[in-house]
Amino acid sequence: MGIVFLRNGSPYVYEAIKTVQYTPFRKWADRGEGGHYVVRRLREADRTLTSQAVKKLRQAGAKFQGKPYDSSFEWSDKRIYCSELVWKIYDRGLGIRVGELQKVRALDLSDPIVKTKMKERYGNKVLLEETVISPGEMFSSDLLVTVIQK
């Protein structure tokens, strides 16, 4: 997950992977399972995403450039995970909250794969009251529409 910005006329995905960085869109898309990817954009983007608005989004995002990836999903600015990056850029840049923040406790943690991953990351000290934004929560936001699906 990331946010697409044009750089010198070419699309790049600003994303949190090892660090927060720009990835050429094609390289990002090629990482999709079986080449699958989806691009969603704000509804009425032609009206909402003016050049001034995009400038504000870039400025909000610049504060995260180079920050390390947050594999423990803490709600802070020291380290950043993918959906947290995009959520904070929209919130801080334009005051738009794409998706509802949740507590870890509200997520479905019953899947065996999720349980194993949680145990690896947190041991027996899962921070159930930690604020999070999940990619699924953002993806399903009514504020977004699908513009590309491959």
Regions inferred by a protein language model and the residue ranges of each:
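Cysteine-nucleophile amide-bond enzymes
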Residues: M1-K150
